[in-house]
């Protein structure tokens, strides 16, 4: 027998949802002003992880979670990532998916996957992260285990991107409805496409006034050859239509292929250093099971480790009894040296690796941008050395060695994957450790080919062959990159001129149907690291986007340019440039450096030299002291005698005098805004 209150609620539900049930014109009585309208019943939302932990307790929560995951077959696993340009809403969309699956509470924390402060402030991803989600399909009631692998989007971190994609079966291709397809989206699309990932196009930010959904869909079709009917228009900010994404992931992205009964094989996706537990590895378990106490063997270093803990990120580290094939999870291997964690390495179980081949695609990341780093105050060297060593623990791709400069004292030679990587490292050093650092002008790895066939890579201008060694050199080579730029049509001419002035070679010009142009240029890496992106943004009023990839080495006519003050080379300001721009660069250097030197009692010559030949010069006139101010106007002989004595004194001072250049002068000169 139905209770009266149940019948009443059913009627209210039917009346309030008359459009859904086909009663479009069903009349309803207007409520009187004295009556308050009934509040709509909100649909039940999944209980968040924090609520479950509080209600069940930590141990019971973990036990129930393990039991639930153990019942999910690998056919119900889905591993995916999000491909997006900077500021297209990747982190916001990730938060909405986590809220939808109950991993976090709505509005509890933004940008869950961006762990570093610099990631939150810049809106970029530097370290690959993952989070696991549990989703129950309403129609069948089946549980699904979803692994969202958050990847860096910038080319500087391409090694992490490719390893992350290798652990996924598909990706969400995120496009901003107001901006359309951008360069970074194009570059990462082709990388994902080359790795056979199933792509689901998502049109984001449809709530904006400038949103143009048909144009964005057309771009997706023309640029990526994807069916616009498959596009899901959403607003990650408001959550509109986000609930349609997970069913699409389950339907379109294939489950990972693996067998937990086979011997263990795990791919290292990324790693970081935790001050309490040491190295934490993010791995994709391809085959087998992995649990605490397992002895791991690295395929590339041949070193062994005892596993201290395994688990999933839910959203933070949640220990599990074991992890198995198909999962993307974390492992604490008891590794003491973080530099042994090689991204792309394969791990086996010790004693069960015979006949097993490492997973393909491993490559050691090669630094492409090198800078000299020095403390702004020499006394801070030991403190800053500890800070840099600690930061390098979390970033194994940084090349580090100590060096000494005659001008700036003791410091370090740092190698980075790119200019953004260097900028992020410097920012983290300053904000996390309060360090004040001077970075020299960036240089790239040049190749010297000798006449006897030997080759040598140099990353420091001091290693450039001197005049005595020139006869042994056959030729020099410098690295090039293939750039991809997207920009509005009206700026095409300006950007082409910019590329030409930076020794660029045009490869392709494609006019898109949406008022945008896609340009491909081969540009020397040395030109790219000299704030090429800043100049590109400046000449397009911020509307251009840029991405690039390695294009190998090419023969080049490069020279070493020295900046000398009174004949003494300043090693901190020595650089390698192309011969065609050496004179212009030399003139720029001497003119700029003159601004930061103080007047002396003797004349100071600032020169730019190439092969001991002066190509540019600026002079700081001597500071004049009036030695005749106390003389009578008629005493001409005494007047001339004092001036001659002053002249001789200045001549002698110039011969033996030395100019002291403070660190503040070098720091001001090396700042990008100068």
UniProtKB/Swiss-Prot annotation:
Pfam families in the cross-refs: EFG_C, GTP_EFTU, GTP_EFTU_D2, LepA_C
Catalytic reactions of this protein: GTP + H2O = GDP + phosphate + H(+)
A GO biological-process term: translation
Binding residues annotated for GTP, in chain numbering: 84-91, 150-154, 204-207
Main location: mitochondrion
Endoplasmic reticulum recorded as keyword: no
Region of interest (Disordered), ranges: 32-51
Cystine bridges: none
Ranges for domain tr-type G: 75-257
Keyword Chloroplast: no
Location(s) in or outside the cell: Mitochondrion inner membrane
GO terms, molecular function: GTP binding; GTPase activity; mitochondrial ribosome binding
Membrane topology: Peripheral membrane protein
Transit peptide, residue positions per record: 1-33
Alphabetical keyword list: GTP-binding, Hydrolase, Membrane, Mitochondrion, Mitochondrion inner membrane, Nucleotide-binding, Protein biosynthesis, Transit peptide
Domain of life: Eukaryota
Group of enzyme by EC: hydrolase
InterPro entries: EF-4, EFG_III/V, EFG_V-like, EFTu-like_2, G_TR_CS, LepA_C_sf, LepA_CTD, LepA_IV
Family the entry assigns: Belongs to the TRAFAC class translation factor GTPase superfamily. Classic translation factor GTPase family. LepA subfamily.
Function comment: Promotes mitochondrial protein synthesis. May act as a fidelity factor of the translation reaction, by catalyzing a one-codon backward translocation of tRNAs on improperly translocated ribosomes. Binds to mitochondrial ribosomes in a GTP-dependent manner.
Name this polypeptide is given: Translation factor GUF1, mitochondrial
Species this protein is from: Lodderomyces elongisporus (strain ATCC 11503 / CBS 2605 / JCM 1781 / NBRC 1676 / NRRL YB-4239) (Yeast)
